[in-house]
């Protein structure tokens, strides 16, 4: 019997927190269940994982489990009075100080961002829907002009395609989540924002410390990771192209 090489990975979240729904996913061809650790607590994820395993074992289906790490991402923080609307041409400030957000400024999660950007840098917010251009940096404040405006709500992602940001490859949360993966017998780790082979090796070392042979999928989400993959096969035998974040930073034709 020929087995198809293309596999179907389904993300299990609150929308499928029913045994009947998981059973339908498995019966219609799901090969791997992805658990996104950018969201939810360990207690929530464990309840979902146990439900999945119970259904999988009842059906006797060979469906793998993937823990997708949050990784070293940058986000805006919260707006005090809910979403705001940014207009093209207006000024807007990103700050590394912890302040209530409003229509003129908002805090960011990365404490050193003001040290790593400068005038002319593009800053893309909310998967590129909002585009800012840095005009100047004063202290902890990054003064920008809005080049592409629109509605903006709390906790949206930030991408900076023109600068290599010096974020750590593994956060404290990632380390806790990797331990969770070991304790609960996950088959794969999808390692977010891998930029170098060393990023993969650091995860491998941590897993080795726990005597785990969980396999690693290197997720390429920015141009640096893509270029490193071209130079260094040590980035891993398994690669996932995260078209959301990658698509924000480079053209789809590339």
What are these regions (language model features)?
Residues 1-254:
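Non-catalytic helical/linker scaffolds that mediate oligomerization, partner binding
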């Amino acid at each position: 019997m020929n087995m198809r090489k293309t596999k179907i990975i389904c993300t299990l979240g609150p929308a499928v927190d029913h045994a009947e729904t998981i059973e339908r996913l498995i019966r219609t061809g799901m090969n791997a269940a992805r658990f996104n650790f950018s969201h939810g607590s360990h207690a929530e994820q464990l309840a979902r994982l146990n439900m999945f395993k119970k259904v999988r074992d009842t059906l006797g289906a060979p469906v793998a489990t993937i823990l997708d790490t949050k990784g070293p991402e940058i986000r805006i923080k919260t707006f005090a009075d809910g979403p705001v609307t940014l207009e093209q041409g207006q000024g807007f400030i990103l700050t590394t100080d912890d302040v209530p957000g409003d229509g003129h400024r908002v805090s960011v999660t990365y404490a050193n961002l003001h040290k790593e950007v400068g005038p002319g840098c593009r800053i893309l917010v909310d998967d590129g829907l909002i585009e800012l251009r840095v005009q100047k940096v004063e202290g902890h404040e990054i003064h920008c002009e809005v080049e592409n405006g629109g509605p903006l709500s709390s906790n949206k992602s930030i991408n900076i395609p023109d600068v290599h940001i010096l974020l750590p490859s593994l956060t404290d949360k990632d380390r806790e989540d990797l331990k969770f993966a070991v304790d609960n017998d996950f088959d794969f780790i999808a390692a977010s924002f891998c930029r170098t082979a060393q990023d993969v090796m650091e995860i491998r070392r941590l897993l080795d410390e726990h005597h785990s042979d969980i396999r690693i999928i290197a997720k390429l989400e920015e141009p640096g990771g893509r270029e490193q993959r071209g130079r260094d096969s040590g980035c891993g035998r398994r690669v996932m192209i995260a078209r959301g974040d990658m698509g924000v930073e480079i053209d789809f034709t590339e």
